[in-house]
Amino acid sequence: MNDLNAALEQRMVDLGKRRSRQQIAKATERGSWAETPAGVILMKKALAPAIKMFEEWRAEALVAKNANYRQRAAVILKDIDPAMAMYVAVRQALSSASNRDSFKYSALSIGNSLAMEILADKFEEKAGALYRTVMRNARARGLGADRQAMAMRKANQWAGVIKEPWDGPTRLIVGTTLLGFVVEATGVIQIVKRRDGKKESQRLELLPKVMEWSERYHEAFGLTRPVYLPLAVPPKDWTTVDDGGFHDVLSFRQRVVTRAFEGQLDALRARPPTQVYDALNKLQNTPWQINARVLAVMDHVWKENLPFPGLPEREDQPIPTPPPEVDAAEKGSDIRKQWRRKVRAIHDHNAEQRSLRFEFVRALNIAQDYSAMDAFYFAYRMDFRGRIYSTGTTLNPQGPDHVRGLLQFSEGVPLGLHGLKWLGIHGANLFGNDKVSFEDRYEWACQNTRNAHLSATDPFASRWWTEADKPWQFLAWCIEWSQAMSMTDPTAFVSHLAISLDGSCNGIQHFSAMLRDEVGGAAVNLVPGPKPQDIYGRVAELTMKKLCTLAAKDSPDAWVYDGWYRFGIDRKMVKRQVMVLPYGGTFRSCLDYTRDAYRERVAAGAEDPFGAPVTGDELKPVPMLAKLIWESIGDTVIAARAAMSWLQQVTRVATKYGQKLTWVTPSGLTVFQDYRETKTRQVKTRFLGALVYSRLDEPTDKLAKSRQVTSVAPNFVHSLDASALVATVNRSAGHGVTAWMMIHDSYGTHAGRTEILARDLRACFVQMYEQHDVLKEFLEGVKATLPVEAHAELPELPARGNLDITDVYESQYFFA
């Protein structure tokens, strides 16, 4: 088995190396070596000094009295954007040097590329409709950058729109001039003389030491990009930041914290978070297997391209041809804006679906490879806040619905009486019937036993399961529920499914607990109730009440409020706005999500109270509604707003004195938050892509004050939900739980042991907030980094409410 695991780890490395080599080879073959990892590094290093050199030269050359080819080039380039010009030059020069092209060819390539950029700008300005038609067609045909430019050039010649910029000699002068700057600025390109028979030519080459470096770098780059797969044996226990996870070839490349801030790993070495390591190791020891029946259905659906939900689209949506009124409209007109928005949405959708297709096919292939294994395992790591993540690529227990539907625990556990109840509740939750009591959910499952049986026995003929919110996990449930209910004693059924218990807007649960907020706590099920509280429904209901009041007033805006009231604000209209609040949500995000929800609902067929969908720029109704939703959120989750504001105030003081943030979580993890300013610019071209590069002449070692302030609340609350998860895993392990599916605020185990997990997660949450005043501890940590005279600038701790945190013990819908 160890030999098998060693082979698997080597395969992960080999797959990563092969993928990296293929990408580098493709870029080099198409003359785009500058797009390789080594090329990008050289570009970013060279671009800023090359731009500066160009700007200084042009300023001097334009006032010089002696006439030469370089002064002529300065006149030609006097209106060119320096960043764009040097981006084109550096990119082309590096690619030419890697290919050992002649100096003349390289210079002409630069001149031609720059000329095409100028031609495209002027072509669109003079004949926008034709330009867009040509480019849209070229992209739809999948043409590369060079052929797109050729198509644009031919269309211009055919239509006679504008005269092409620069003749051949001029392009050579421009390219030669810019190439000289590149050679000087990069320090990595040499011009060498080569003899071919009697003919001698000058060629561009990368310096030998640069070629050697790039080869070593690309080899190392491939090693650092493994394709993570499940392991054949339990992963190595984490004992230090550098030791754990993988056993063999990957072991020396892994650290327990991904993307740690400078100094954090040293802090963890000095103060090991043993509780966190214990939880990581328990999760790593959870054995998994592929759900063969779900895999068979999914594989057939994909191969036959059947119209089943929950999977990515197999084909791109076609890009529509603009109607005549769009082509005839003036540039910048509303009709043009609306059309561009529509087309952009399709492009974005297609790009997203292509990515999802790639991830899905990879997950499906991995599942097929592992389908014969009785048990496999996932290595786990954490981010700088302590949030725990599986390292599996595409196939892992924290994946989307179709991935989680493919996975089940290798170990089976008899349901028992409690387990049968939890299995039934789980089915109702997956279907979307999760706003009612547990009793009603279980009753729903019992009433739909026949539907579940039909879906399980013939999922292609009986498609009831496809109506579920999470269809692929629900199909797995149908199979087990059908089997259990077919037995004389369903409680004896041995279940392999992971039963999930989800927090109710978990970030707000934590903020309400730390400040003992009885209003917010009641809204997110920190107190007992006969059925689950719906914070999204509460916010929607409060917003509707405000709309009703404002619509009845004699004011110029009453018609807007009346329109929204008639439109109806339901939980879906406010859900995203509420969800993101504890994770750094602002009024700006509230406005954006409100606009999105409105557009989606109108697109789905709802009658628009304002006559036309929101176009984005001039509309008054959406900001007015967003303001009311934002107020209603604040009225519902008072403590969350107060705690977030307080955290930001403390952070402002710390950043004023140049101090990063450090705090220790209840699980014993030392967290660093130390965002630094990065001064960047982005160069965009029409045919050669874009590059974000550093301005090397500007400081990059300053604290990013704004980011420090806006990030502290989400990072702080994430560190707390991670602590609760760690405590829950460790406690439940002591009570007999042996397998977990944990996703931040969603806890899962076998149905037969869900009662234990439900009890322990409540105990851990209550004890965490009984034993820790997390805001006070955070404040003391900040004080320790500041001079004494700065302490007076720190705000007082926010006031606490009267919530009895022990009510969580009796709240059955706290995690449900």
Question: Which functions belong to the PLM regions below?
Answer:
Residues M1-V578, P582-N715, R731, H735, ...:
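Non-catalytic nucleic-acid-binding interfaces of large nucleic-acid enzymes and RNP effectors
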